[in-house]
From Swiss-Prot:
A UniProt-annotated Pfam family: Ribosomal_S20p
NCBIfam families from the UniProt entry: S20
Keywords: Ribonucleoprotein, Ribosomal protein, RNA-binding, rRNA-binding
Protein name (Swiss-Prot/TrEMBL): Small ribosomal subunit protein bS20
Domain of life of the organism encoding this protein: Bacteria
InterPro entries membership: Ribosomal_bS20, Ribosomal_bS20_sf
GO annotation, biological process: translation
Function: Binds directly to 16S ribosomal RNA.
Organism: Karelsulcia muelleri (strain GWSS) (Sulcia muelleri)
Lineage, opening ranks: Bacteria, Pseudomonadati, Bacteroidota, Flavobacteriia, Flavobacteriales
Family of this protein: Belongs to the bacterial ribosomal protein bS20 family.
């Protein structure tokens, strides 16, 4: 267990950040699933999902290579 006030504060901050990252990642994953289900109908959703994935990579929630890989798979799926 943490002994200092600053260590306790860091734990609180880390827990909050973890929850925020988890939420953003989950919403992106559900958006990707929706796009996969409606790939031919919903072509307008790809730019939004692509920007979400880029934001995840920019915030280092996912690795930039993984974001490129996901976007590449989605483009192949749409075309």
């Amino acid at each position: 267990m943490a002994n200092t006030k600053s260590a306790l504060k860091q734990i609180r901050k880390n827990n909050l950040k973890r929850l925020q990252n988890k939420f953003v990642l989950k919403t992106t994953k559900t958006a990707i699933k929706k796009l996969k289900l409606e790939s031919k109908k919903n072509l307008n959703a790809f730019p939004k999902i692509s920007s979400l994935i880029d934001k995840l990579a920019k915030k280092k929630i996912i690795h930039k290579n993984k974001s490129n890989r996901i976007k590449s798979k989605l483009v192949k799926l749409i075309n």
